[in-house]
Amino acid sequence: MGKAKAPRQLKDNEAKAVARTLRVSPQKLNLVASMIRGKKVNAALADLTFSRKRIAGTVKKTLESAIANAENNHDLDVDALIVAEAYVGKSIVMKRFHVRDRGRASRIEKPFSHLTIVVREVAEKGKAA
């Protein structure tokens, strides 16, 4: 087993937001998370606004929460933020049964996911510090 891993500490120029127990499979959520990873937050918000994926609205809400955390809790400049990390974790899987013909039943699995978004303030290129 080994020791439990310590949670990652945020740096001074970072802020994060976590959405837990989202009713979507981790694979589908990771498609949307990888779409915004590494982008400036304004571009990421625009991409999520016009995405046709069902979960994109929830990801956008989580990203807006991370931006608000950066602005209000960490005093970071919103215009200089990028999506440093956007990762997905597995949560519970609800098991349900679907009645079939001839007296049989099939199992339906309804997966849930966790989403963590970390935004980081980067220095603008070309500006004198």
From Swiss-Prot:
Q: Which GO terms describe its biological process?
A: translation
Instruction: Tell me which UniProt keywords the record has, alphabetically.
Output: Ribonucleoprotein, Ribosomal protein, RNA-binding, rRNA-binding
Question: Is Lyase found in the keyword set?
Answer: no
User: InterPro entries annotated for this entry?
Assistant: Ribosomal_uL22 (IPR001063), Ribosomal_uL22_bac/chlpt-type (IPR005727), Ribosomal_uL22_bac/org-type (IPR047867), Ribosomal_uL22_sf (IPR036394)
A molecular function (GO) held by this record is: rRNA binding
One Gene Ontology term, aspect cellular component = cytosolic large ribosomal subunit
Q: Does the keyword Protein biosynthesis apply?
A: no
| Purpose | This protein binds specifically to 23S rRNA; its binding is stimulated by other ribosomal proteins, e.g. L4, L17, and L20. It is important during the early stages of 50S assembly. It makes multiple contacts with different domains of the 23S rRNA in the assembled 50S subunit and ribosome.
Q: So what family is this one in?
A: Belongs to the universal ribosomal protein uL22 family.
Could you describe the subunit structure of this protein?
Part of the 50S ribosomal subunit.
Record-given protein name: Large ribosomal subunit protein uL22
**Provenance organism:** Brucella abortus (strain 2308)
